[in-house]
Amino acid sequence: MAIKLIVGLANPGTEYAATRHNAGAWYVDLLAERLRAPLREEPKFFGYTSRITLEGEDVRLLVPTTFMNLSGKAVGAMVSFYRIQPDEILVAHDELDLPPGVAKFKLGGGHGGHNGLKDIISKLGNNPNFHRLRVGIGHPGDKNKVVGFVLGKPPVSEQKLIDEAIDEAARCTELWFKEGLAKATSRLHTFKAQ
């Protein structure tokens, strides 16, 4: 099944743009830049969107302009308009359980406490069977510090690692369309930024 929608999760506004919680949007921004497909605000989809072509496949890019916990509103609008199935969606999000410099593809699973994923699963009729790109941001070491951590900006050294992992994830996304998910996954899962 080909991917028809790639979503980068984020909170809107300049005050959140550089926070860890916006790592998913950084990936979609990079894809849009690499493929020369600038994102434009599209109110009916509650987000910034663009259209790219990968190996002859039409793919929509989406960065919701809703707050993170309402991400499903944007995804739901696009899915119903373009008749996209859950397994044709790739959602990029920040991942506490992976260190900076690591990114991994995954199909299905729970939301792991991520409010963006939680809302998307709910708006897809409680169907969690969409693809995810988990962008490692690390963990503060104390669950009580998670909110401040994800809404904080990574130090320069961590930002560099996250950026390198996102860069590799973008290359592996293109590889996915060329040579399949297994090959793309194998390459991405052996990558660790230094």
Curated annotation (Swiss-Prot):
Q: Does the keyword Phosphoprotein apply?
A: no
Site annotation (Discriminates between blocked and unblocked aminoacyl-tRNA) points to: 11
Q: Which InterPro entries match?
A: Pept_tRNA_hydro (IPR001328), Pept_tRNA_hydro_CS (IPR018171), Pept_tRNA_hydro_sf (IPR036416)
PROSITE patterns xrefs: PEPT_TRNA_HYDROL_1 (PS01195), PEPT_TRNA_HYDROL_2 (PS01196)
| Protein name according to UniProt | Peptidyl-tRNA hydrolase
SUPFAM superfamilies the UniProt entry points to: Peptidyl-tRNA hydrolase-like
Q: Where in the cell is it found?
A: Cytoplasm
EC no. given is: 3.1.1.29
Q: What is its main location?
A: cytoplasm
